[in-house]
Regions:
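Periplasmic/extracellular loop-to-transmembrane helix junction in inner-membrane transport proteins
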Residues: 1-15, 183-186
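Loop-to-helix entry region at the N-terminal start of transmembrane alpha-helices
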Residues: 2-6, 73-102, 144, 149, ...
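Hydrophobic positions within alpha-helical transmembrane segments of bacterial inner-membrane proteins
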Residues: 10-22, 26, 107, 140, ...
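Transmembrane-helix boundary motif in ABC transporter permease subunits
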Residues: 11-44, 118-119, 137, 207, ...
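Transmembrane alpha-helices
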Residues: 15, 41, 45, 97, ...
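Membrane-interfacial helix termini and adjacent extracytoplasmic/periplasmic loops
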Residues: 55-96, 130, 166-170
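Glycine-rich helix-loop "coupling/hinge" segments at transmembrane-helix boundaries
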Residues: 60, 160-188
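C-terminal transmembrane helix and the adjacent membrane-cytosol boundary/short C-terminal tail
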Residues: 108-119, 123, 190-221
Length: 221
Protein backbone atom coordinates (compact mmCIF):
# COMPACT_ATOMS: atom_id res chain seq x y z
CA UNK A 1 0.00 0.00 0.00
CA UNK A 2 0.98 3.64 -0.33
CA UNK A 3 1.24 4.00 3.45
CA UNK A 4 3.71 1.14 3.77
CA UNK A 5 5.63 2.42 0.77
CA UNK A 6 5.82 5.88 2.29
CA UNK A 7 7.03 4.48 5.61
CA UNK A 8 9.68 2.40 3.83
CA UNK A 9 10.93 5.33 1.74
CA UNK A 10 10.96 7.65 4.76
CA UNK A 11 12.88 5.16 6.90
CA UNK A 12 15.39 4.47 4.12
CA UNK A 13 15.82 8.20 3.54
CA UNK A 14 16.45 8.67 7.27
CA UNK A 15 19.07 5.91 7.24
CA UNK A 16 20.76 7.36 4.14
CA UNK A 17 20.90 10.87 5.59
CA UNK A 18 22.34 9.43 8.82
CA UNK A 19 25.01 7.48 6.92
CA UNK A 20 25.99 10.59 4.94
CA UNK A 21 25.38 13.14 7.69
CA UNK A 22 27.36 11.38 10.44
CA UNK A 23 30.80 11.54 8.77
CA UNK A 24 29.97 15.00 7.41
CA UNK A 25 29.18 16.34 10.89
CA UNK A 26 32.25 14.63 12.33
CA UNK A 27 34.43 16.16 9.63
CA UNK A 28 33.10 19.65 10.37
CA UNK A 29 33.48 19.21 14.15
CA UNK A 30 37.15 18.28 13.74
CA UNK A 31 38.00 21.32 11.60
CA UNK A 32 39.68 24.38 13.15
CA UNK A 33 37.12 26.69 14.75
CA UNK A 34 37.81 29.43 12.19
CA UNK A 35 36.75 27.20 9.28
CA UNK A 36 33.74 25.49 10.88
CA UNK A 37 31.44 28.40 10.06
CA UNK A 38 32.42 28.11 6.40
CA UNK A 39 31.55 24.39 6.29
CA UNK A 40 28.25 24.99 8.10
CA UNK A 41 27.52 27.77 5.62
CA UNK A 42 27.97 25.30 2.75
CA UNK A 43 25.61 22.83 4.46
CA UNK A 44 22.87 25.45 4.86
CA UNK A 45 23.11 26.87 1.32
CA UNK A 46 20.33 24.55 -0.01
CA UNK A 47 17.89 26.13 2.49
CA UNK A 48 18.32 29.43 0.65
CA UNK A 49 16.68 28.07 -2.49
CA UNK A 50 13.15 26.93 -3.18
CA UNK A 51 12.38 23.23 -2.58
CA UNK A 52 11.14 22.82 -6.15
CA UNK A 53 14.37 24.27 -7.56
CA UNK A 54 16.46 21.91 -5.41
CA UNK A 55 14.39 18.96 -6.59
CA UNK A 56 14.68 19.99 -10.24
CA UNK A 57 18.46 20.18 -9.79
CA UNK A 58 18.47 16.52 -8.75
CA UNK A 59 16.23 15.67 -11.72
CA UNK A 60 18.79 17.16 -14.11
CA UNK A 61 21.57 15.11 -12.51
CA UNK A 62 19.87 11.68 -12.46
CA UNK A 63 17.88 11.76 -15.70
CA UNK A 64 18.91 9.48 -18.58
CA UNK A 65 21.04 12.22 -20.16
CA UNK A 66 22.14 13.56 -16.77
CA UNK A 67 25.49 13.83 -15.05
CA UNK A 68 25.39 10.41 -13.36
CA UNK A 69 24.65 8.42 -16.51
CA UNK A 70 27.07 10.51 -18.59
CA UNK A 71 29.97 9.79 -16.23
CA UNK A 72 29.15 6.08 -15.94
CA UNK A 73 28.89 5.76 -19.73
CA UNK A 74 32.21 7.53 -20.31
CA UNK A 75 33.91 5.32 -17.72
CA UNK A 76 32.51 2.25 -19.46
CA UNK A 77 30.77 1.03 -16.30
CA UNK A 78 27.42 0.81 -18.12
CA UNK A 79 26.55 0.32 -21.78
CA UNK A 80 23.20 2.12 -21.71
CA UNK A 81 21.72 4.83 -19.47
CA UNK A 82 20.26 3.55 -16.20
CA UNK A 83 16.64 4.36 -15.50
CA UNK A 84 16.97 6.18 -12.19
CA UNK A 85 14.40 8.91 -12.73
CA UNK A 86 10.76 8.13 -11.88
CA UNK A 87 11.73 5.32 -9.48
CA UNK A 88 11.79 4.88 -5.70
CA UNK A 89 15.57 5.26 -5.88
CA UNK A 90 15.17 8.72 -7.43
CA UNK A 91 12.78 9.74 -4.66
CA UNK A 92 15.19 8.54 -1.96
CA UNK A 93 18.12 10.35 -3.57
CA UNK A 94 16.08 13.54 -3.83
CA UNK A 95 14.80 13.44 -0.26
CA UNK A 96 18.26 12.58 1.08
CA UNK A 97 19.66 15.67 -0.65
CA UNK A 98 16.78 17.90 0.46
CA UNK A 99 16.76 16.84 4.13
CA UNK A 100 20.49 16.19 4.69
CA UNK A 101 21.07 19.54 6.48
CA UNK A 102 18.37 18.60 9.00
CA UNK A 103 20.52 15.60 9.95
CA UNK A 104 23.92 17.27 9.84
CA UNK A 105 23.11 20.24 12.09
CA UNK A 106 21.85 18.28 15.16
CA UNK A 107 24.72 15.80 14.75
CA UNK A 108 27.22 18.64 14.60
CA UNK A 109 25.69 20.23 17.71
CA UNK A 110 26.32 16.96 19.59
CA UNK A 111 29.77 16.32 18.13
CA UNK A 112 30.90 19.86 18.89
CA UNK A 113 30.59 18.99 22.58
CA UNK A 114 32.61 15.78 22.24
CA UNK A 115 35.60 15.43 24.54
CA UNK A 116 38.14 14.22 22.00
CA UNK A 117 40.45 13.23 24.85
CA UNK A 118 38.16 10.22 25.36
CA UNK A 119 38.73 9.20 21.74
CA UNK A 120 42.49 9.61 22.13
CA UNK A 121 42.35 7.55 25.32
CA UNK A 122 40.54 4.80 23.44
CA UNK A 123 43.28 4.67 20.81
CA UNK A 124 45.93 4.74 23.54
CA UNK A 125 44.30 1.59 24.94
CA UNK A 126 44.66 -0.03 21.49
CA UNK A 127 40.98 0.16 20.63
CA UNK A 128 40.20 -0.28 16.94
CA UNK A 129 38.47 2.58 15.04
CA UNK A 130 35.15 0.70 14.94
CA UNK A 131 35.35 0.06 18.69
CA UNK A 132 35.98 3.76 19.34
CA UNK A 133 33.05 4.64 17.09
CA UNK A 134 30.69 2.11 18.66
CA UNK A 135 31.62 2.48 22.33
CA UNK A 136 32.65 6.14 22.62
CA UNK A 137 31.43 8.36 19.79
CA UNK A 138 27.95 6.95 19.09
CA UNK A 139 26.79 6.87 22.76
CA UNK A 140 27.91 10.48 23.21
CA UNK A 141 26.22 11.80 20.05
CA UNK A 142 23.08 9.66 20.37
CA UNK A 143 20.84 12.68 21.19
CA UNK A 144 21.91 14.34 17.93
CA UNK A 145 21.30 11.12 15.99
CA UNK A 146 17.78 10.81 17.39
CA UNK A 147 16.96 14.49 16.84
CA UNK A 148 18.27 14.40 13.27
CA UNK A 149 16.39 11.20 12.50
CA UNK A 150 13.11 12.68 13.71
CA UNK A 151 13.71 15.93 11.80
CA UNK A 152 14.26 13.94 8.60
CA UNK A 153 11.63 11.23 9.07
CA UNK A 154 8.68 13.55 9.75
CA UNK A 155 8.93 15.82 6.67
CA UNK A 156 9.98 12.96 4.37
CA UNK A 157 6.91 10.96 5.40
CA UNK A 158 4.60 13.76 4.26
CA UNK A 159 6.74 14.86 1.32
CA UNK A 160 4.82 16.01 -1.74
CA UNK A 161 7.03 18.00 -4.13
CA UNK A 162 10.00 15.62 -4.34
CA UNK A 163 7.93 12.44 -4.97
CA UNK A 164 5.81 14.32 -7.53
CA UNK A 165 8.80 15.55 -9.55
CA UNK A 166 11.18 12.60 -9.22
CA UNK A 167 8.51 9.90 -9.03
CA UNK A 168 6.71 11.14 -12.12
CA UNK A 169 3.28 10.74 -10.54
CA UNK A 170 3.59 6.95 -10.67
CA UNK A 171 5.35 6.39 -7.33
CA UNK A 172 3.05 8.22 -4.94
CA UNK A 173 3.59 8.81 -1.25
CA UNK A 174 1.10 9.77 1.45
CA UNK A 175 1.38 13.48 0.68
CA UNK A 176 0.60 12.89 -2.99
CA UNK A 177 -2.38 10.69 -2.14
CA UNK A 178 -3.80 13.31 0.23
CA UNK A 179 -3.44 16.03 -2.40
CA UNK A 180 -5.11 13.76 -4.96
CA UNK A 181 -8.13 13.19 -2.71
CA UNK A 182 -8.58 16.89 -1.93
CA UNK A 183 -7.88 17.95 -5.52
CA UNK A 184 -8.86 15.76 -8.45
CA UNK A 185 -10.67 13.10 -6.41
CA UNK A 186 -12.88 15.57 -4.52
CA UNK A 187 -13.02 12.94 -1.79
CA UNK A 188 -12.56 15.17 1.21
CA UNK A 189 -13.61 12.61 3.87
CA UNK A 190 -10.90 10.18 2.68
CA UNK A 191 -8.39 13.01 2.39
CA UNK A 192 -9.18 14.09 5.95
CA UNK A 193 -8.85 10.52 7.23
CA UNK A 194 -5.47 10.16 5.53
CA UNK A 195 -4.32 13.49 6.96
CA UNK A 196 -5.33 12.47 10.49
CA UNK A 197 -3.55 9.13 10.08
CA UNK A 198 -0.40 10.96 8.98
CA UNK A 199 -0.66 13.27 12.00
CA UNK A 200 -0.95 10.26 14.33
CA UNK A 201 2.21 8.73 12.85
CA UNK A 202 4.03 12.05 13.24
CA UNK A 203 2.89 12.39 16.86
CA UNK A 204 4.05 8.83 17.56
CA UNK A 205 7.48 9.67 16.13
CA UNK A 206 7.65 12.81 18.29
CA UNK A 207 6.67 10.78 21.36
CA UNK A 208 9.52 8.36 20.69
CA UNK A 209 11.91 11.31 20.45
CA UNK A 210 10.66 12.91 23.69
CA UNK A 211 10.97 9.63 25.59
CA UNK A 212 14.49 9.00 24.31
CA UNK A 213 15.49 12.58 25.07
CA UNK A 214 14.13 12.20 28.63
CA UNK A 215 16.05 8.95 29.15
CA UNK A 216 19.23 10.49 27.78
CA UNK A 217 18.83 13.52 30.02
CA UNK A 218 18.20 11.32 33.05
CA UNK A 219 21.24 9.22 32.19
CA UNK A 220 23.51 12.27 32.02
CA UNK A 221 22.00 13.61 35.23
Amino acid sequence: SIFLRSLKLSLMTTVLTLLVGFPTAYFISTRPEKTREFWLFLITIPFWTNLLIRTLAILVIIRNEGLVNTILLKLGIIDAPMQILFTDTAIMIGMTYVYLPLMVLPLYASMEKLDFRLIEAGYDLYAKPMQVLRKIIIPLVKPGMIAGSILVFIPSLGAYVTPSVLGGGKNMMIGNLIELQFGQGRNWPLGSALSITLMIIVMAALLVYVRNASKTGAGHG
